[in-house]
Amino acid sequence: MAQQVSGRQPRYKRILLKLSGEALMGSEDFGIDPKVLDRMALEIGQLVGIGVQVGLVIGGGNLFRGAALSAAGMDRVTGDHMGMLATVMNGLAMRDALERSNIPALVMSAISMVGVTDHYDRRKAIRHLNTGDVVIFSAGTGNPFFTTDSAACLRAIEIDADVVLKATKVDGVYTADPFKDPHAEKFDHLTYDEVLDRKLGVMDLTAICLCRDHKMPLRVFNMNKPGALLNIVVGGAEGTLIEEGQA
């Protein structure tokens, strides 16, 4: 059930939350951890409870990694299509977790899957968001060679979201991988051009350029920190904010 969070007013009306498929694994090496799904559903429910409209894009890396198969000779387009199907599986699992918490949710797929998901339709997605449904966008952009990060930024622009929130395993963007370099320093704020110039690897080039060209703010944060998502939505300074530079 969507939880009411008293006394906290949202800064954003509509967000696009990007989750990695790996985030759904929890402590496992593969697949989906039901406890992680339930926790994420609870946090998303808190946002719905304060009137925030939530669009969601989930990667597929917990179920399928095309890089190794591509290196072994698999056709890239075939691998990308398999990856798209993995994102649909994750979307269905998340919808189930949300609905078990009495949070209405809809899965839309960029690839037609009659009887399994709704086909992606921008106007229909916005109507559902306006009624308080969580809309899960799956199958990426529907095209090979585009990442789910690019899909998240594209959908955010299409539905006129206020911000893209990218959930990761670390609490923002660093000068280097903080798991490998103990001297890595965290950025609190960056411009799109700084991300590109420094080759920080927050998202792929296409995704960052989409956000830059359409002035879509992007915040990178640690989804494993309890309450971080809600704190961002009510105006907290979690993680790293990436936005247009000041003229």
From Swiss-Prot:
<feature type="binding site">
    <location>
        <position position="61"/>
    </location>
    <ligand>
        <name>ATP</name>
    </ligand>
</feature>
<keyword id="KW-0665">Pyrimidine biosynthesis</keyword>
<feature type="binding site">
    <location>
        <position position="60"/>
    </location>
    <ligand>
        <name>UMP</name>
    </ligand>
</feature>
<feature type="binding site">
    <location>
        <begin position="18"/>
        <end position="21"/>
    </location>
    <ligand>
        <name>ATP</name>
    </ligand>
</feature>
<dbReference type="GO" id="GO:0006225">
    <property type="term" value="P:UDP biosynthetic process"/>
</dbReference>
<dbReference type="Pfam" id="PF00696">
    <property type="entry name" value="AA_kinase"/>
</dbReference>
<dbReference type="InterPro" id="IPR011817">
    <property type="entry name" value="Uridylate_kinase"/>
</dbReference>
<comment type="function">
    <text>Catalyzes the reversible phosphorylation of UMP to UDP.</text>
</comment>
<feature type="binding site">
    <location>
        <position position="65"/>
    </location>
    <ligand>
        <name>ATP</name>
    </ligand>
</feature>
<feature type="binding site">
    <location>
        <position position="168"/>
    </location>
    <ligand>
        <name>ATP</name>
    </ligand>
</feature>
<dbReference type="InterPro" id="IPR015963">
    <property type="entry name" value="Uridylate_kinase_bac"/>
</dbReference>
<feature type="binding site">
    <location>
        <position position="177"/>
    </location>
    <ligand>
        <name>ATP</name>
    </ligand>
</feature>
<feature type="binding site">
    <location>
        <position position="174"/>
    </location>
    <ligand>
        <name>ATP</name>
    </ligand>
</feature>
<comment type="subunit">
    <text>Homohexamer.</text>
</comment>
<dbReference type="InterPro" id="IPR001048">
    <property type="entry name" value="Asp/Glu/Uridylate_kinase"/>
</dbReference>
<dbReference type="GO" id="GO:0033862">
    <property type="term" value="F:UMP kinase activity"/>
</dbReference>
<keyword id="KW-0808">Transferase</keyword>
<comment type="pathway">
    <text>Pyrimidine metabolism; CTP biosynthesis via de novo pathway; UDP from UMP (UMPK route): step 1/1.</text>
</comment>
<dbReference type="GO" id="GO:0005524">
    <property type="term" value="F:ATP binding"/>
</dbReference>
<dbReference type="InterPro" id="IPR036393">
    <property type="entry name" value="AceGlu_kinase-like_sf"/>
</dbReference>
<feature type="binding site">
    <location>
        <begin position="141"/>
        <end position="148"/>
    </location>
    <ligand>
        <name>UMP</name>
    </ligand>
</feature>
<keyword id="KW-0067">ATP-binding</keyword>
<dbReference type="GO" id="GO:0005829">
    <property type="term" value="C:cytosol"/>
</dbReference>
<comment type="similarity">
    <text>Belongs to the UMP kinase family.</text>
</comment>
<dbReference type="GO" id="GO:0044210">
    <property type="term" value="P:'de novo' CTP biosynthetic process"/>
</dbReference>
<keyword id="KW-0547">Nucleotide-binding</keyword>
<protein>
    <recommendedName>
        <fullName>Uridylate kinase</fullName>
        <ecNumber>2.7.4.22</ecNumber>
    </recommendedName>
</protein>
<keyword id="KW-0963">Cytoplasm</keyword>
<keyword id="KW-0418">Kinase</keyword>
<feature type="binding site">
    <location>
        <position position="80"/>
    </location>
    <ligand>
        <name>UMP</name>
    </ligand>
</feature>
